[in-house]
Curated annotation (Swiss-Prot):
This is Plasma membrane fusion protein prm1. Belongs to the PRM1 family. Involved in cell fusion during mating by stabilizing the plasma membrane fusion event. It comes from the Eukaryota. The gene is prm1. Glycans are attached at residues 177, 222, 245, 256, 274, 454, 483, 490, 505, 552, 566. Coiled coil: none annotated.
């Protein structure tokens, strides 16, 4: 039966193919040429819609998402810029306050320094007074001990020696006086006898001599003997020793002289110390006060503006790059899609011949024609199996995983991952600039510390100059007199030694005691005086004062330590809030934006991954079902399986019944439709060779069906184009038989 216009009432979407026939009364359907005027889309019409292929659309959607992400990132960076500028302004104000701290702290530090100097000078005065008095009394005590000890030894030696000498002289004088008188008397008696005899002799001689007119004098020794009798040692023989004994020195003059001379320099030093340090007050106006500092580092070429401007330029550049790349990719995607459409069109034309042949499974033919690539992939994978049942299951699993809905889910997930990748690349480009901001923030801290160090160093230099001048003044006015007094004391000791030596020289000069006394003096006093002089010389060389100077980092040490690399706690930085774990507030703003975008990318990646996992789950469902049926033998009718599908038999005219009434039209109101008409019949084309003829059905065949035999299924004819098999020679034969 031919199609008629009344067929439109049965299936409104079915075209009136018989209307195209040259003679409507003929009983054959005229096939329309594919390149002519057809109700379906031709190649040119298909190619006109290549630009809206799925990959171009997905790439454009990715581009839109990347542009939205770039715009969102730019908006977030603008917000971060405002927050960073606000934080930078706060840091700038705090840095200016920190840099101005020397101005405020110097007043208190100056007062502390001045008070410390005054207290030190007051303590120095007390120490000097006590030291001078102690040294004065100590020197006098030592000298007094020395010369009094020497005086005791001297008196002992001299007086003992004089007393012994005077006693010896007196005894010797008394002995000599008594002995000489007795000797004189004895000599006088002897001389008188001799003189009488001698005079008598002389008288005889004179008698003779008178004859010659001469005379001999007589001997008279009485006067000499009287003199000898009256001879005695003079009483003045021990007057010198008595005088020496009575004239031993007591060194009272030396004592008075020494005390007068020694006390004079000490008293002068005390007087000068009292005059110089009596009411010493440090002049606080001499200490400097640094000026206030105003730091500006938030603006300018190295400020926050330049950083965020560079980030904005980077985002804009990245957006342009993504626009260019994705648009070019979307455009280039049209080329393979156009080639794919051309191949699909050719494949559809080739495989459309299957519709004109008798196919055992027309749905398979429709699937192969409508989904050429997925069907080809299934056939390619199924060709690796020799069992027809497994070939069917493999094709079914691939078809299940490549339905338009499943592929839409897969493409959506892949597009989401591609979008996340583009956003990640953009984020990585922005993250590379964060260390630059950290470096700039570190430079901000360095600027504050440098300003503090400069102010602190300038203040310390000026203050140290004042302290040095004060130390020099004290050394000249106070310790200068100490040096003078030590020199004078050394001179006094020399004078003491000279004076003592003079006294000894006047007393014992030219005597036997002079040398021993001088040796004792040098041993007992001279060596001690030399030791004292050495000590005074050391005091003279080291008597000066040096007040400790102020370090150059008085005001900057703490700030410099807080940003140093040795700081274990980043929150110690003076640019960080209390409790912050980041190094400062400025980089925290940018890091927060980066973390926000990163969280968004992570969320989108998870969503895209879940979408892909949904497709994987769908594919696994098909794979699991196919694997389950892989090892299950198909049950025949006798085992509870389904009935055998009868082949449509061609009648004598070559027509086949097409049950068009089996297709329900849910969009049409049943009341508006006319009653169903008999199903039309297709007329076989005279130019087409039927690939498969009707199989005569014997009674035995019907009996086999009743008994449950599956019978043969001619799947091979459904996959042949122009008599050639589309698969291997082992295509679909028997379920339970391997190919031969």
């Amino acid at each position: 039966m031919l199609f008629s216009r009344s067929g439109r009432s049965i299936f409104p979407l079915l075209p009136p193919y018989a209307a195209h026939a040259p003679n409507p009364n003929q009983g054959h359907i005229i096939a329309l040429p594919p390149d002519g005027l057809t109700p379906y889309l031709g190649l040119r019409a298909r190619l006109s819609q290549v630009w809206i292929n799925r990959w171009t659309i997905l790439l454009l959607l990715v581009l839109v998402r990347v542009l939205l992400a770039a715009s969102g990132l730019q908006a977030d960076m603008s917000t971060a810029k405002r927050e960073a500028l606000s934080a930078c302004t706060s840091v700038e104000s705090m840095g200016s306050s920190m840099a101005s701290m020397p101005h405020y702290l110097s007043q208190g530090v100056n007062e502390l320094t001045a008070t410390g100097v005054e207290k030190a000078v007051s303590g120095l005065k007390s120490m000097l007074m006590l030291t001078i008095t102690g040294v004065e009394e100590l020197v006098l005590f030592i000298i007094k001990v020395l010369y009094q000890t020497y005086l005791c030894l001297f008196t002992l030696a001299v007086r003992g020696s004089v007393h012994v000498a005077v006693g010896v002289i007196k005894e010797a004088a008394d002995f000599l006086n008594s002995t000489v008188k007795e000797v004189g008397d004895d000599i006088g008696k002897a001389v008188s006898t001799f003189e009488s005899a001698f005079n008598k002799f002389l008288d005889g001689v004179n008698t003779v001599a008178s004859a010659f007119g001469a005379s001999v004098p007589t001997l008279d020794l009485n006067s000499s003997i009287s003199t000898l009798e009256n001879l005695q040692l003079p009483s003045s023989i021990d007057q010198g020793l008595d005088k020496l004994n009575s004239s031993l020195p007591t060194f009272d003059e030396v004592n008075n002289f020494t005390q007068t001379v020694l006390r004079t320099p000490f008293e002068e030093v005390k007087k000068l110390v009292n005059e110089s340090l009596g009411t010493y007050t440090f002049d606080r106006s001499l200490l400097p006060v640094p000026a206030k500092e105003q730091l500006t580092f938030c603006e300018g070429s190295n400020g926050i503006d330049s950083f965020f401007d560079s980030v904005t330029d980077l985002v804009m550049k990245a957006r342009k790059i993504f626009i260019a790349i994705l648009i070019v990719a979307a455009t280039l995607a049209c080329v393979p899609m156009a080639w794919q459409e051309i191949r699909r069109w050719r494949s559809m034309k080739e495989r459309s011949q299957l519709v004109r042949k008798e196919a055992h499974d027309p749905m398979d033919v429709v699937y192969i024609v409508s989904r050429p690539y997925t069907a080809a992939a299934g056939i390619k994978a199924a060709s690796r199996f020799s069992n027809s049942r497994r070939q069917i299951l493999v094709r079914w699993a691939i078809a299940y995983a490549t339905t338009p809905a499943a592929l839409f889910v897969l493409c959506l997930g892949v597009a989401g991952l591609l979008s996340c990748l583009c956003q990640y690349l953009l984020l990585q480009a922005v993250e590379k600039t964060v260390p630059e901001l950290s470096t700039q923030v570190g430079a901000f801290a360095d600027k504050v510390v440098d300003s503090l160090q400069n102010a602190s160093a300038e203040w310390a230099n000026d203050a140290n100059g004042v302290i040095g001048h004060m130390s020099q003044d004290l050394n000249e006015n106070v310790f200068g007199w100490v040096n003078t007094s030590t020199t004078a004391l050394n001179d006094t000791l020399n004078t003491f030694v000279d004076k003592t030596t003079g006294v000894l020289n006047d007393t014992f000069g030219g005597t036997l005691l002079y040398e021993p006394l001088m040796d004792v003096f040098g041993c007992l006093i001279g060596l001690k005086v030399q030791g004292i002089q050495k000590g005074l010389t050391w005091v003279h060389d080291h008597a000066h004062i040096d007040f400790p100077l102020l370090p150059n980092d008085t005001f900057s040490r703490g700030a410099a330590a807080s940003i140093s690399s040795n700081s274990s706690n980043p929150s110690d930085s003076f640019l960080a809030d209390a409790g912050d774990q980041t190094s400062n507030k400025i980089t925290e703003v940018v890091i927060r934006v980066v973390n926000k975008v990163e969280d968004g990318i992570r969320t989108e990646t998870i969503i895209s991954g879940v979408i892909i996992l949904i497709w994987v789950f769908i594919a696994l469902i098909g794979i699991v079902r196919a694997l389950t049926l892989f090892w299950v033998r198909d049950r025949n009718r006798g085992e509870g399986g389904g009935a055998r599908v009868n082949h449509h038999l061609s009648d004598a005219g070559g027509f086949i019944d097409v049950p068009l009434t089996a297709v329900s039209n849910t969009n049409t109101d049943a009341r508006s439709m006319p009653p169903p008409a008999p199903a039309p019949r297709y007329e076989a084309s005279t130019s087409t060779v039927v690939a498969s003829r009707a199989v005569p059905v014997s009674s035995t065949h019907h009996e086999d069906e009743k008994l449950g035999f599956a019978g043969e299924r001619q799947y091979g004819s459904a996959l042949k184009v122009d008599g050639a098999a589309d698969l291997r020679g082992s295509s679909y034969v028997e379920y339970d038989m391997e190919k031969r």
